[in-house]
């Protein structure tokens, strides 16, 4: 495991943890002699021991603060060269200069890691989380109750951010599904449009063919009508001439009888 990166949260010096995990056997525990066990035969009986008043157990404030810090900000562990190292959060109180230095380090890291000033930025969120943890550490050393209250605030913020992140991921997944569906619908629509355009071209070709046939038919009918009209006119003229001739002949026959 790679050693943890530098953090704005102040830690103590790393400590090498002993990897001797041997456990005492049950037999070893049974070999203990009870204080009430009688001695060997012939020996004088033991007198009861006088119980001395014990001093009242006063909790060590420093140790109590360290325990609270370890509960709020757990130590970080890593393995290096098959050796387990542990690094606890520092319990050293901070001064005003430490706070000023923390602000300078925050601004420097934001600039070095090119964190975005606006919008969603994981780098900016990570650095501000480290800064907030460091502030919780500094406050907890001076007042454990205030530190625990800040811990609740931090956990609430993380829970809210996690909920928003889950909602964002769900929205992105929903948007991707809708985009894929729209893309698939677009492909189907494009295919249908291509089919309709092909059908349209076929229908236009058929319309043009029918128009050509209609024009040819109209032309033939017009020519036939003209021929028929000419023929009818010639027949009418012939019949008129015949009628005039017959009329003249009839008048010639009738006129001498008078």
Swiss-Prot record:
Q: Which PANTHER family match?
A: AXONEMAL DYNEIN LIGHT INTERMEDIATE POLYPEPTIDE 1, AXONEMAL INNER ARM DYNEIN LIGHT CHAIN 28
Q: Which residues form a coiled coil?
A: 176-255
Q: Where is the composition biased (Low complexity)?
A: 34-48
The cellular component terms of Gene Ontology attached to this UniProt record, alphabetical and capped at eight, are: axoneme; ciliary base; dynein axonemal particle; dynein complex; motile cilium; sperm flagellum
Q: What is this protein called?
A: Axonemal dynein light intermediate polypeptide 1
Any idea where this protein resides?
Cell projection, Cilium; Cell projection, Cilium, Flagellum; Dynein axonemal particle; Cytoplasm
Q: Which InterPro entries match?
A: Axonemal_dynein_light_chain (IPR019347)
- Gene Ontology biological process terms from the UniProt entry: sperm flagellum assembly
Give the quaternary structure.
Interacts with CFAP45. Interacts with DYNC1H1.
Keyword annotations for this protein, in alphabetical order, are: Cell projection, Cilium, Coiled coil, Cytoplasm, Dynein, Flagellum, Motor protein
Q: Where is this region: Disordered?
A: 19-60, 207-231
Q: Which GO terms describe its molecular function?
A: dynein heavy chain binding
């Amino acid at each position: 495991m790679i050693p943890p990166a530098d953090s704005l949260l102040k830690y103590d010096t790393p400590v090498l943890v002993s990897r001797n995990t041997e456990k005492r056997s049950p037999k070893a525990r049974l070999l203990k002699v009870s204080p009430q066990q009688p001695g060997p035969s012939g020996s004088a009986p033991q007198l009861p021991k006088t119980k001395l008043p014990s001093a009242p157990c006063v909790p060590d404030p420093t140790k109590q603060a360290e325990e609270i810090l370890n509960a709020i900000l757990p130590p970080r562990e890593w393995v290096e060269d098959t050796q387990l190292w542990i690094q606890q959060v520092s319990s050293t109180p901070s001064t005003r200069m430490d706070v000023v230095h923390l602000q300078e380090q925050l601004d420097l890291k934001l600039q070095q890691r090119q964190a975005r000033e606006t919008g969603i930025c994981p780098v900016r969120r990570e650095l501000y989380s480290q800064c907030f943890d460091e502030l919780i550490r500094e406050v907890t050393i001076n007042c454990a109750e205030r530190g625990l209250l800040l811990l609740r605030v931090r956990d609430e913020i993380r829970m809210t951010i996690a909920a928003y992140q889950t909602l964002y991921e769900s929205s992105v997944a929903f948007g991707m599904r809708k985009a894929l569906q729209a893309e698939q619908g677009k492909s189907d629509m494009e295919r249908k449009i291509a089919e309709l355009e092909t059908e349209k071209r076929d229908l236009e070709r058929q319309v043009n063919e029918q128009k050509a046939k209609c024009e040819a038919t109209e032309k033939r009918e017009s020519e036939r009508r003209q021929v028929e009209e000419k023929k009818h006119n010639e027949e009418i003229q012939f019949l008129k001439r015949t009628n005039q001739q017959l009329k003249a002949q009839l008048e010639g026959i009738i006129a001498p009888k008078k």
